[in-house]
Amino acid sequence: RITMGFLFTSESVSEGHPDKVSDQISDAILDEFLRHDPNSKVACETLCTTGLVVVAGEVRSEAYVDVQGVARRVINQIGYTKGDYRFDGNSCGVVSAIHEQSPDINQGVVREAEEEQGAGDQGIMFGYACNETREFMPATLILSHVILKELAVIRREGKVMTYLRPDSKSQVTIEYDEQTNRPLRVHTIVVSTQHDEFILPGNGLTEKEAEQQMQERIREDVRTILIPRVKARLERAGDKLADLITGDYILHVNPTGKFVIGGPHGDTGLTGRKIIVDTYGGRGAHGGGAFSGKDSSKVDRSAAYAARHIAKNLVAAGVADEVLVELSYAIGIAQPLSIYVDTYRSPRPAALAGMTDGEIARRIGKLFDLRPAAIVKRFGLKNPIFEATASYGHFGNRPYRKSVKVWEHGVETEREVEFFGWEKLDAVDDIRREFEL
């Protein structure tokens, strides 16, 4: 009999999506505080709407940050540089309502001995990994991200599809094999992108006809320019995901028709509203806490990064094909209250034949120091590395080192720091030893 596959879908949004504009401003402000004072405590929320950015939050820091300047730089960098967009970096208003962190919170978090620093809040955090892509991420999400990354490259090059504006979304549905849970092929791709009004009514063209011609042109360009470039990009990187995009997928482009009004003028953006795009595209689980604008004393962020690091290293070490890790914390307490592991009954090596998920979790607790200060140290989370995480996902990126400007003792200097350190596979050997693999 023919086995039917099942369908799973993930979405992504571009750096020009209003919620992502907010995330990037929040993280850029966090980075600016950390550049001047690595011990800054920051919780920064941003709202973007027509012609206006509002930044609010709690900060405890020795540093002064030019909030207006940072927000404008981010907005211009994303590409909101024209008055037509009704939101641009040079003319929008920027209101800052940042005030000091509550001493009640501070006393529970800051300790004499740094390694005993308590968690900044209670909460649950999840980390997930699977072996269906070389990033140890769901294929649906990786493809959704890559489509929009390539669209942004095309927009910035300005050679083809010159009508592109910064706001866009993608969605990818993949058919999986019911027996093996492996991805078989891309079933549906949705691309919605903001664009200039590049065909105007007049000269015998009605408004409806002009709109239809624009839509046909954009659809054709996505089919013949964007998707082939996405495939080529994956092939250049030696990525097998390219093989999933065959000729018979369904393509929807700007299904409502015209998409000229967009960005923060079309929809108000808020920090922390794209938490599934930021993580695993609907796979695994999510504790509900957003990442952007929070310094690493907030376990919402640092412990979610640590949980991803554990899950990814467990899968890479061959413990299971798919792993979910949950950590929980209480405010002011350093050690996690619980560690939970779910291997989804996925195949595991003979050496682990009788081992329960509970036993795996107990061993993880022994292998990894999950106190907030230890996590911060392991991944260098006091460095200004967060703006890079605020678009196209916090996970599934390659770790890299780069020189950044920081201030030490009132003097600006360059320091090499690591980005996406939680994606390193540096615990695989320890895990294999522990589990005798």
Task: Annotate the PLM regions.
Residues 24-28, 142, 146, 302-309:
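Short amphipathic alpha-helical face segments that pack within enzyme cores
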Residues 9, 69, 76-261, 391, ...:
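Glycine-rich, mobile lid/loop segments that gate access to catalytic sites or pores
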Residues 11-13, 17-22, 117-134, 259-285, ...:
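Conserved phosphate/anionic-ligand binding catalytic regions in large, soluble enzymes, centered on
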